């Protein structure tokens, strides 16, 4: 902002002063805000940690428990019944003079898209680890997502009250599995009663929580000279030594001082904050959310080490004082209608304000609310850096960028390019800025699909409306119409995802829909290149329609559509208008959505236009339909092979059960990648297996292991199939198996 103000040329002095004062106000206002996400593998204790934060901050009067179904952040009926987080929820609470906006995100792989959108709204994250399990499959997934967004993070090792908890292993997992630099600022200890206590590395104190008042208070005790104190002093010295190699201010003090004992706690904290915000290290804390230990110090660490909004998202400075807000979630309230959760990146949103979403639709903010899961407090205006709920937005979808106007967005993109030394504005650079602003959403491929039908014809419209609303909330839910069967088809991320959708339609919209059997979302790819010419001539409503297209399909991983610019075809293609080329492209690419064998999406395939002759007065719709028909003919001629979704599994079981589990996996066409020791008695199997072979596998695993094994599963791409498996897959899709 300042660099735009300082280079403003002949801007009137009063206007410049107003902009500078607004800039200073925004900075001072947002310095007391922390926007954080809570990320974890399923069952690591993420929601329990969130509930304790709300309780100790005074936001709630009682402790919410997952197993009792009375949590604030898991407010959906399905979440409370299952004890898992399905939708991201936002809560705001005060702590030590700061305002913390916290997003509790799902831990189950089926809801990864919820996590992805939420990370656009936060400035830092807390990653919760299960102290008995360390880094798990979904931990790696959410960590990778946080890396993508360049988010500073803290690690909180939970469940440290358990006898099988292993703090050192968790720290080593962070270092080896996540390839990060963990910095331990706490270590586990025991108090006089044998309960979990925490030794603070920086202050050299032992922290003990009081069970009688539900952990509201805790005592700090300076450690007496002992082996524990000597070990903790060594850890403090190691911390100073590690940070001094990363922070110049601390290094200067260390060089000039005679002893590490002379380095103040405040100086260590400042150095650790800078290193954390620069993503050079990850501070590691510990506790037990369920036993009410360590949560207040975790909130202190959020305030101390994670960045304020003003320290992040400088890319949005190009908006100046104009509004820039990222939509990261939409929920539907029975009384208030659609409610849109927005992270305000720049500017101020006021009640009654007119906004433009990045897709061009105009919206009016009828009301503004402060978030507390499913409760709302109305406010009049919200400043940059904060999170707000907007009512009245009718067209906005998850992932949109809200701005004051289309002009504001274009000017911001132009300023951004100028600041990066790019003055031209070609299409590729436009796409780059869209990606930088997070406008270009990447929706994961569905791995399952099924038909959905209303209980009666009269409920069809209501069901379609419910699906539209659920799609606005959840971009990973695919809804399409199968013209062959006449059915509405849902695509989703897993069995749980589809089950939750059905359950929500019943509980929230009172429609008892019928889901068809789950089908694997196979993909198709061509076997060999193929070229053909299709000429179609027809008279429609007295107007002659005439199209002749020569198209080719070839193997290609990058581009969907290209032009054959060879000398014999270039002169013809140069006569086509850009609009005509766009129509041919749209029709051709649409045909790739449904392959000839099982109706799967055709991938790794490029359509190449060689020649096009279009009669005068021919409608665009006719050209588009001809292009689609031509590609369908090519796919049938060239033939396609099936690609099936592959899942990556981590199975943990006692050593004596491993042979039986591996024998069963081999019958499921699984590829064993590794078998690793997991503690003293267990082993962990890393395996890839086709999704088609994993139906009901959780139950089968329980039977084989007598209930002693656990499993996590997540998508791991697509793989080719042999002819026998392809034939079996076709029979399954046709309902013959």
UniProtKB/Swiss-Prot annotation:
Chain positions recorded as GTP binding sites: 40-47, 104-108, 158-161
InterPro entries: EF-G-like_DII, EFG2, EFG_II, EFG_III, EFG_III/V, EFG_V, EFG_V-like, G_TR_CS
Compartments (UniProt record): Mitochondrion
This protein's record includes keyword Chloroplast: no
Every tr-type G domain range: 31-310
Keywords carried by this UniProt record: GTP-binding, Mitochondrion, Nucleotide-binding, Protein biosynthesis, Transit peptide
Ranges in a coiled coil: none
GO MF annotation list: GTP binding; GTPase activity
GO CC list: mitochondrion
Main location: mitochondrion
Residue span of the annotated presequence: 1-29
GO biological process: mitochondrial translation; ribosome disassembly
NCBIfam families in the record: small_GTP (TIGR00231)
Family note: Belongs to the TRAFAC class translation factor GTPase superfamily. Classic translation factor GTPase family. EF-G/EF-2 subfamily.
Function in brief: Mitochondrial GTPase that mediates the disassembly of ribosomes from messenger RNA at the termination of mitochondrial protein biosynthesis. Not involved in the GTP-dependent ribosomal translocation step during translation elongation.
HAMAP family, A to Z: mEF_G_2
UniProt protein name: Ribosome-releasing factor 2, mitochondrial
Organism: Drosophila persimilis
Gene that produces this protein: mRRF2
